[in-house]
C-alpha cells in the first residue's frame, strides 16, 4: 500500500480549494436556506461541478434543542465579524476523494467566506467548534446524503407565516418543494434534533447513505466525520 505521508512522517496538506464562484449566479431567497440548498445541489449536479448523481454532496442542517445557532461570516449580520444567531441554518458540503487526496468544500450562499470554501476554513471561521462548551448554544449537524435529500425533502413554507397567515419573510417565486412520495411538508423533521440523536461515529458513517433524515453529529465529531466517508 502506498505511503501517503511526506518526509518526516508529516501528513501532506489538503489540496487547495477551486477558485471561488459567483454566488449570485445561483438561486437564493433570503431566509429560505433549506430551499436554497435543495436547488444548489441540483445545480451543482446539472453543471457538472459535482458527481452526476450527486453522491459527493451532503445537505447539512445546523440547529440545536433551543433553536439558537451562532455562526460567523454571515451576510445577514450587522456586526463586523458577521455574527448571526440563527434558529437553524442549512449548508451544502461536497466531499471528494481523488488520487488519495481529500477535498471537502462548503457551499454556503449566506456566507461572506469564499464560495465554495474549504471545509477546514469554514469550520474554523464560521462555526468555531466548542466555542460554547456544553451551553445551550452548542451546535448539532444533521447530515443527509444529497440523493436522499433531493428525493425526500418537502416544505410548504408554513413556518414563514404568522398566526394571521401573513408572510414573515417573502417566499421564493417558484413552486414549493414536494417530495417524491407526495409529502408536502417535513421541514421540522430535519431541523429538530437533540444530543440523544448522536450515535457512534462508525455507524453514522454508514447510516448517512440510507437514512431519510440522515444522521446527527455534534461539534466534537464534525471535524472528523467527513474524513471517515468513503468518498
Curated annotation (Swiss-Prot):
It holds the Pfam family Nt_Gln_amidase. Its EC number is 3.5.1.122. It catalyses: N-terminal L-glutaminyl-[protein] + H2O = N-terminal L-glutamyl-[protein] + NH4(+). Keywords: Hydrolase. GO terms for biological process: defense response to bacterium; positive regulation of camalexin biosynthetic process. InterPro entries: N_Gln_amidohydro_ab_roll_sf, NTAQ1, Prot_N_Gln_amidohydro_ab_roll. Residues 11-21 have a biased composition (Pro residues). The active site is at residues 33, 89, 108. Gene3D superfamilies: Protein N-terminal glutamine amidohydrolase, alpha beta roll. GO terms for cellular component: cytosol; nucleus. The keyword Hydrolase applies. Residues 1-21 are annotated as: Disordered. It comes from the Eukaryota. The keyword Amino-acid biosynthesis does not apply. One of its GO terms (molecular function) is protein-N-terminal asparagine amidohydrolase activity. Belongs to the NTAQ1 family. Monomer. Mediates the side-chain deamidation of N-terminal glutamine residues to glutamate, an important step in N-end rule pathway of protein degradation. Conversion of the resulting N-terminal glutamine to glutamate renders the protein susceptible to arginylation, polyubiquitination and degradation as specified by the N-end rule. Does not act on substrates with internal or C-terminal glutamine and does not act on non-glutamine residues in any position. This is Protein N-terminal glutamine amidohydrolase. It comes from Oryza sativa subsp. indica (Rice).
Amino acid at each position: 500500500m502506498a505511503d501517503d505521508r511526506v518526509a518526516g512522517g508529516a501528513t501532506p496538506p489538503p489540496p487547495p480549494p477551486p477558485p471561488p464562484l459567483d454566488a449570485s449566479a445561483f438561486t437564493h431567497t433570503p431566509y429560505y436556506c433549506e430551499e436554497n440548498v435543495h436547488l444548489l445541489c441540483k445545480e451543482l449536479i446539472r453543471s457538472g461541478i459535482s458527481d452526476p448523481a450527486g453522491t459527493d454532496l451532503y445537505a447539512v442542517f445546523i440547529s440545536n434543542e433551543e433553536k439558537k445557532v451562532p455562526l460567523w461570516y454571515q451576510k445577514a449580520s450587522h456586526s463586523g465579524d458577521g455574527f448571526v444567531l440563527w434558529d437553524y441554518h442549512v449548508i451544502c458540503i461536497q466531499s471528494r476523494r481523488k488520487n488519495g487526496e481529500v477535498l471537502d468544500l462548503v457551499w454556503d450562499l449566506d456566507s461572506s467566506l469564499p464560495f465554495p470554501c474549504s471545509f477546514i476554513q469554514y469550520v474554523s471561521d464560521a462555526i468555531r467548534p466548542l466555542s460554547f462548551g456544553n451551553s445551550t448554544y452548542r451546535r448539532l449537524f444533521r447530515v443527509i446524503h444529497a440523493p436522499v435529500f433531493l428525493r425526500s425533502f418537502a416544505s410548504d413554507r408554513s413556518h414563514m407565516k404568522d398566526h394571521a397567515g401573513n408572510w414573515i419573510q417573502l417566499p421564493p417565486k417558484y413552486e414549493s418543494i414536494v417530495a417524491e412520495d407526495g409529502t408536502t411538508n417535513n421541514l421540522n423533521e430535519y431541523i429538530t434534533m437533540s444530543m440523544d440523536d448522536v450515535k457512534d461515529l462508525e455507524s453514522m458513517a454508514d447510516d448517512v447513505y440510507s437514512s431519510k433524515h440522515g444522521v446527527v453529529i455534534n461539534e466534537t465529531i464534525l471535524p472528523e466525520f467527513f474524513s471517515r466517508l468513503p468518498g
